[in-house]
């Protein structure tokens, strides 16, 4: 199908439907648009249409004339004048409207992917609906002449008053006034009927919503200097509603009323005779039309009266955009309620006032949720002050008159506006005295709490503490204070306790005294080998604790002093000692648990006498002998220059800190210092045995080094017999010898 070849950057058609336009659509829209035959045959505006077109900025030099290119694309494509659009209105899709700012088909094809979601749904209703020879955006020649050639200031030669429609190549047929009226009546009726059919199939319109407009608006990106495109470009859902409600703002603004009074429908005929409003007489001369038809036709002129949108949009695009407005207003389409579109034609005629005033009321409630221009207009600033910044005063007068024109279809527009103004303060005014009972104290700020306290000062009661006055005054000053409620709770608790829980006659002191006396009486009868789990004295006095009993604890008849075995405080310690004893039995020797804790003052002097005459160190731990040859007394060589008496005690301290009880036997045996308790012969023999034993177990992990080995061998050769104690070398070798002797003695005793 042929498409328009217009290459103007400002004239790019874009439609919501994937199907191209054909002539029947434009023919019917032509007879229903601004510059239809009714408008040109109007006797009251023979010359004002040129002024109006020039005023709307269509003759701007930045809009190049396109008369020749347009007619060249539609040569030999004019349809027959006998074709009537009513025959195929059952398949007409009301969503096929032209959006101003969309451009020709070449631009529409450029942005077609944005409508892929709605393409399949519209194909079945749009295919084979119109004559396929002329497709795309086609506007009658007189539209083109005004919209392109010389700023719509030249009246097309094809139209003259009283003449029948005339056909020429590349130009649409022009019909008489009666035919135009008949076409418009049928068009409105069928349009509403098909809109109902389509919206029943698609209760929510698949068109782009307002959320898509901000990110998918190519005109804002391509022509950022045209600020009006943000409001009216592409007529997406949001800008269309913004423009629609913006035009009604002066009806609700009190400052607008003295300048633009909204007269009844018949009284405004003389006012419209002026040049700025002359092109809207067509509708007013046919009041016999149905209310729904008037509603659709009224809102068709909405964008035409705004010069800031007409300055940037040619006539043809504005023509198609008004069809979108008819479809919206015929079904009372609010921006947030698209699902309410399913209105029948009969219902639309019955509720004419609702169709006209419904959007006003919705805007009064939801003015904040709409476009930002609505918020600015609702700020009690006259709309003409804002528009005077962009257009002349003549345009403002035309727009103001067109505002009043929209209200003419309602019976009493002044009463509607005043009723809305009276309702508005009710939504703003708040009765704080009533809302106090529904809000908690935590929701109020400090200032609001103070204000409520001041108001409720006279209502406060005197039966509660002043601390709670601030909290209770905001909610209910007559309520009982918090402390009284707490006191009642406490009283109930005491009452229940006195009734249900009888206190015993015996005190705690008496009860524990009885237990103590009974245990003291039975203490002598307690067996020594009784189970501690059943016979434990948990209330042992200090005297009993200090009283120690002697008993046979080990099978080898080792006499130890122990405390009462049934005492719970010593049970854990006793078990720990037994566990350590069992571990030692697996190694070499079984020792008494008291022998391990030699540091205890109670057991420091306990001794066991062996048959060989040697005293057994009570604090000696019997463990693996190899542990004693792994890096033992390395500090002996570091302290050889010290005095012997100081060195012995220092070595004792270092070894007790480093190895625990492993080296504690060297200098203290049985709690007393005994360095020379053996004879000289015994010491020599033990030294030799310890030396060879050390050399036997010396290895890479041992404590013996070559230095010590060489020294010991040299000392052995030079001194076959130990020298006297006054020899200086003896003082140097004595720590090592004493260490060797002690280790040898330990080894011998363990070996036996």
From Swiss-Prot:
Q: Where are the transmembrane segments?
A: none
Which residue ranges have biased composition labelled Basic residues? 1-13
Name this polypeptide is given? BCLAF1 and THRAP3 family member 3
* UniProt source species: Mus musculus (Mouse)
Asked whether the UniProt record includes Amino-acid biosynthesis among its keywords, one would answer no
Region Disordered: list its residue ranges.
1-114, 132-177, 190-252
Q: Domain of life of the organism in this record? A: Eukaryota
Basic and acidic residues bias: start-end ranges? 23-57, 85-109, 190-199, 222-231, 238-252
- In the UniProt record, which is one GO cellular component term? mitochondrion
- A Pfam match is THRAP3_BCLAF1
Phosphoserine (modified residue): where? 15, 17, 78, 80, 205, 592
Q: Which UniProt keywords apply?
A: Isopeptide bond, Mitochondrion, Phosphoprotein, Ubl conjugation
User: Which protein family is it in?
Assistant: Belongs to the BCLAF1/THRAP3 family.
């Amino acid at each position: 199908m042929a498409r328009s070849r217009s290459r103007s950057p400002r004239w790019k058609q874009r439609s919501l439907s994937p199907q191209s336009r054909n002539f029947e659509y434009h023919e019917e829209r032509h007879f229903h648009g601004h510059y239809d035959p009714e408008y040109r045959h109007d006797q009251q505006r023979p010359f004002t249409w040129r002024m109006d077109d020039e005023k709307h900025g269509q003759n701007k030099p930045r809009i190049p004339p396109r008369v020749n290119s347009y007619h060249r694309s539609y040569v030999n494509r004019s349809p027959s004048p006998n074709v009537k659009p009513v025959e195929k209105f059952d398949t007409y899709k009301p969503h096929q409207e032209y959006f101003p700012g969309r451009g020709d088909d070449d631009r529409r094809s450029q942005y077609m992917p944005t409508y892929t979601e709605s393409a399949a749904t519209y194909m079945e209703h749009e295919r084979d609906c119109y004559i396929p020879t002329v497709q795309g955006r086609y506007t009658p020649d007189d539209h083109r002449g005004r919209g392109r050639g010389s700023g719509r200031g030249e009246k097309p030669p094809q139209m003259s008053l009283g003449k029948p429609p005339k056909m020429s190549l590349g130009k649409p047929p022009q019909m008489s006034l009666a035919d135009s009226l008949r076409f418009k009546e049928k068009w409105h009726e069928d349009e509403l009927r098909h809109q109902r059919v389509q919206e029943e199939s698609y209760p929510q319109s698949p068109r782009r919503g307002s959320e898509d407009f901000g990110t998918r608006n190519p005109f804002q990106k391509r022509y950022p200097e045209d600020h009006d495109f943000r409001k009216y470009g592409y007529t997406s859902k949001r800008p269309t509603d913004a423009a629609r409600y913006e035009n009604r703002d002066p009806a609700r603004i009190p400052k607008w009323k003295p300048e633009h009074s909204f007269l009844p429908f018949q009284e405004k005929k003389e006012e419209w005779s002026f040049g700025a409003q002359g092109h809207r007489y067509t509708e007013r001369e046919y009041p016999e039309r149905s209310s729904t038809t008037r509603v659709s036709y009224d809102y068709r002129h909405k964008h035409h009266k705004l010069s800031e949108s007409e300055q940037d949009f040619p006539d043809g695009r504005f023509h198609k955009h008004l069809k979108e407005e008819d479809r919206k207003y015929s079904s009372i389409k609010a921006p947030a309620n698209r699902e309410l579109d399913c209105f029948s034609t009969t219902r639309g005629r019955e509720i004419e006032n609702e169709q006209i005033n419904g959007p006003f009321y919705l805007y009064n409630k939801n003015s904040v949720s709409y476009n930002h221009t609505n918020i600015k207009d609702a700020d009690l600033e006259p709309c003409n002050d804002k528009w005077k910044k962009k257009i002349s005063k003549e345009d403002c007068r035309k727009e103001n008159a067109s505002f009043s024109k929209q209200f003419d279809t309602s019976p009493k527009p002044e009463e509607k506006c005043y009723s809305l103004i009276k309702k508005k303060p009710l939504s703003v005014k708040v009765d704080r005295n009533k809302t106090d009972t529904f809000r908690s104290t935590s929701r109020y700020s400090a200032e609001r709490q103070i204000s409520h306290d001041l108001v409720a000062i006279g209502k406060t009661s005197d039966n509660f503490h002043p601390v709670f006055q601030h909290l209770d005054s905001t909610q209910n000053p007559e309520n009982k204070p918090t402390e009284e409620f707490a006191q009642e709770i406490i009283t109930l608790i005491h009452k229940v306790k006195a009734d249900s829980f009888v206190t015993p006659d015996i005190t705690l002191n008496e009860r524990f005294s009885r237990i103590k006396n009974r245990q003291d009486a039975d203490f002598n009868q307690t067996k020594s080998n009784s189970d501690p789990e059943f016979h434990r004295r948990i209330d042992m006095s200090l005297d009993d604790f200090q009283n120690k009993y002697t008993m046979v604890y080990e099978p080898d008849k080792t006499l130890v002093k122990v405390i009462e075995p049934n005492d719970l405080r010593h049970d854990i310690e006793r078990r720990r000692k037994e566990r350590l004893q069992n571990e030692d039995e697996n190694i070499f020797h079984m020792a008494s648990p008291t022998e391990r804790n030699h540091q205890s003052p109670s057991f420091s002097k306990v001794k066991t006498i062996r048959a060989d005459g040697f005293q057994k160190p009570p604090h000696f731990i019997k463990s693996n002998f190899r542990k004693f040859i792994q890096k033992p007394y390395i500090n002996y060589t570091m302290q050889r220059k010290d005095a012997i008496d100081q060195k012995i005690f220092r070595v004792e301290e270092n070894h007790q800190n480093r190895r625990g009880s492993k080296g504690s036997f060297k200098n203290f045996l049985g709690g007393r210092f005994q360095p020379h308790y053996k004879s000289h012969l015994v010491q020599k023999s033990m030294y030799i045995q310890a030396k060879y034993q050390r050399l036997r177990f010396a290895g890479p992990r041992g404590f013996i080094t070559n230095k010590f080995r060489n020294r010991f061998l040299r000392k052995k050769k030079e001194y076959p017999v130990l020298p006297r104690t006054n020899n200086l070398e003896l003082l140097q070798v004595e720590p090592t010898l004493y260490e060797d002797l002690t280790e040898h003695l330990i080894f011998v005793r363990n070996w036996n």
